[in-house]
């Protein structure tokens, strides 16, 4: 019903196609993350006519979709191979493919059979084949939609390595970022700053009288006393450093010196204030063609702030470990396909 899922009235859509064997999966993802704004939402059901392989082949040369996201429960006979081949062709054509495969457990396989009459097959075989074809593999539903948002935002950005820059005014968040750079699925590193970067960071810290509280490091804990200018300038310096390939910045929404609220009469907290973090970080994002991800770890009162960042092409996560994990999976997949010819 329109009352439960209102159609967005937009004049333009993102260059994304989401293909799913479940119509409800499509509706729920779009309801949770309307900012995805896909050009196509396609429900395949039990593939009685067109198959997942057919749909992937259609988008290989499409000039309307650069990101293709697929939720699959199973393939028709021999269609899994066609699908993997189409993924490889799509990636070679500059597309980004995001893939979630259902039926990972014996119970899950039985459930897919009852849902779309799909034979789920061996999950690990399927995952390895599609990954090697060049798709970005989502491990859960939340990650699926977050990877779509990263792919949309960073479609034209350079991914040249695995060296992250991390900055936050919350000590636990800086530690959490460092703790999240490696897992069984990915392995990133924290980049080393150039001497000119370290010098510029120290000058900023000295100017703001934070020098007795802040030590230049990666991750960079800039203390809760760091204002919007410090946050944005540190992100700018990191992105400008050739030794850093992407930046994750914690925006400390509860800090008394950051502008992160929409509904407030206190000018010092208003997110639309001139010179606030929204204005400053947007300018930084526009200047550099490297991935920049924000973390806004706070309650519902900060949702307008998160939405405003997303509108400015800055992906936002509610917790730092999810930000690092999703960005890492995305970057490693982008690096892998660089070798495809």
Which sequence ranges carry the predicted segments?
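Catalytic-core regions of core metabolic enzymes
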Residues: 1-341
């Amino acid at each position: 019903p329109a009352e439960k899922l209102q159609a967005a009235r937009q004049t333009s859509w993102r260059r994304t196609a989401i293909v799913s064997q479940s119509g409800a999966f499509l509706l729920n993802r779009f309801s949770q993350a309307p900012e995805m704004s896909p050009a196509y939402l396609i429900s395949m059901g039990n593939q009685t006519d067109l198959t997942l392989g057919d749909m992937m082949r259609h988008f290989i040369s499409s000039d309307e979709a650069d990101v293709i996201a697929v939720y699959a429960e199973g393939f028709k006979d021999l269609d899994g191979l066609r699908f993997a081949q189409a993924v490889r062709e799509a990636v070679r054509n500059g597309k980004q493919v995001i893939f979630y495969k259902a039926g990972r457990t014996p119970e899950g396989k039985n459930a897919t059979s009852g849902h779309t009459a799909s034979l789920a097959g061996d999950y690990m075989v399927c995952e390895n084949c599609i990954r090697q074809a060049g798709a970005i593999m989502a491990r859960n539903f939340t990650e699926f939609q977050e990877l779509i948002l990263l792919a949309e935002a960073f479609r034209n950005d350079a991914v040249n390595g695995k060296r992250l820059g991390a900055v936050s005014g919350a000590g636990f968040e800086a530690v959490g970022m460092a703790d999240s750079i490696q897992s069984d699925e990915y392995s990133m590193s924290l980049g080393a700053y150039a001497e000119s970067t370290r010098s510029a960071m120290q000058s900023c810290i000295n100017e703001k009288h934070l020098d007795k509280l802040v030590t230049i490091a990666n991750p960079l804990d800039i203390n809760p006393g760091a204002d919007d200018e410090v946050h944005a300038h540190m992100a700018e310096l990191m992105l400008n450093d050739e030794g850093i390939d992407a930046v994750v910045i914690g925006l400390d929404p509860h800090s008394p010196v950051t502008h992160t609220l929409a509904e407030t009469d206190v000018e010092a907290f208003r997110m639309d204030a001139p010179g606030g973090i929204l204005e400053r970080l947007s300018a930084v994002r526009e200047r550099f063609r490297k991935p920049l991800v924000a973390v806004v770890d706070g309650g519902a009162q900060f949702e307008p702030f998160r939405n405003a960042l997303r509108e400015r092409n800055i992906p936002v996560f509610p917790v730092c470990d999810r930000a690092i994990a999703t960005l890492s999976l995305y970057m490693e997949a982008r690096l892998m396909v660089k070798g495809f010819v």
